[in-house]
Amino acid sequence: MKSALTIALFCAGGGLARYYLSGWVYGLLGRAFPFGTLAVNLIGAYCIGLIMEISLRSTLIPATLRLGLTVGFMGGLTTFSTFSYETFKLLEDGQYLVAMVNALASVVMCLLCTWLGVITARALIQGGF
């Protein structure tokens, strides 16, 4: 029960963070490209790499907190469904190049951000950052 409550509370925080952060990014850059969704997914990808690597290599993050941060907060922050819908709408609107750029950029950049999170965690744990 404690884990489920932790996940639920953190998920609410992640959802609010996504709402405000993506809205802020869209306000800055407009909606011609799904920059808001890309931004929250990139941040989430970096953070999950960082959190999971720290959790696997040390005892700095207790198991319940790890669940809250990864399943809860990152689950609420990131959004594959919105990415899918926005890409579908771009295709439906005939913006094939923009849709392909979004799909490719999202996958490649999210993997890169996860890798950066992992190497950041390793450097922090080894004290070489």
UniProtKB/Swiss-Prot annotation:
Catalytic activity, as annotated: fluoride(in) = fluoride(out)
GO biological process: cellular detoxification of fluoride
Main location (coarse class): membrane
A Pfam family of this chain: CRCB
Entry GO terms, CC: plasma membrane
Record-annotated membrane-spanning stretches: 5-25, 32-52, 60-80, 99-119
Activity regulation comment: Na(+) is not transported, but it plays an essential structural role and its presence is essential for fluoride channel function.
Localization per record: Cell inner membrane
Name by which UniProt lists this protein: Fluoride-specific ion channel FluC
Species: Pelobacter propionicus (strain DSM 2379 / NBRC 103807 / OttBd1)
